[in-house]
Amino acid sequence: MKNTILILFTAFIALLGFFGMSAEADPIADPIADPISGPNAEADPEAINLKAIAALAKKLFG
């Protein structure tokens, strides 16, 4: 059961990375953007929240 959940979780993260994270959408990759400011969550509401994903994985897998 745990292996199945781990495989599904890994596949989900891979799909998010494949479809959601491209160089064009990355504010850090923009040379015109202010280098001091980090990624703006308000500018990209569909941005992946890695901290929330890590917390969920930690909660699921102990």
Swiss-Prot record:
It comes from the Eukaryota. One of its GO terms (molecular function) is toxin activity. Keywords: Amidation, Antibiotic, Antimicrobial, G-protein coupled receptor impairing toxin, Immunity, Innate immunity, Mast cell degranulation, Membrane, Repeat, Secreted, Signal, Target cell membrane, Target membrane, Toxin. Residues 1-25 form the signal peptide. One of its GO terms (biological process) is innate immune response. Expressed by the venom gland. AXPX repeats lie at residues 25-28, 29-32, 33-36, 43-46. Residues 26-47 form a propeptide. Antimicrobial and mast cell degranulating peptide. Has broad spectrum antibacterial activity against both Gram-positive and Gram-negative bacteria (S.aureus MIC=16-32 ug/ml, S.xylosus MIC=1.5 ug/ml, S.alactolyticus MIC=8 ug/ml, C.koseri MIC=4 ug/ml, E.coli MIC=4-32 ug/ml, K.pneumoniae MIC=32 ug/ml, P.aerugiosa MIC=96 ug/ml, S.choleraesuis MIC=16 ug/ml, S.typhimurium MIC=32 ug/ml, V.parahamelytics MIC=16 ug/ml). Is also active on multi-antibiotic resistant hemolytic E.coli O157:H7. Acts by affecting membrane permeability. This is Mastoparan-AF. It comes from Vespa affinis (Lesser banded hornet). The lineage of its organism: Eukaryota, Metazoa, Ecdysozoa, Arthropoda, Hexapoda.
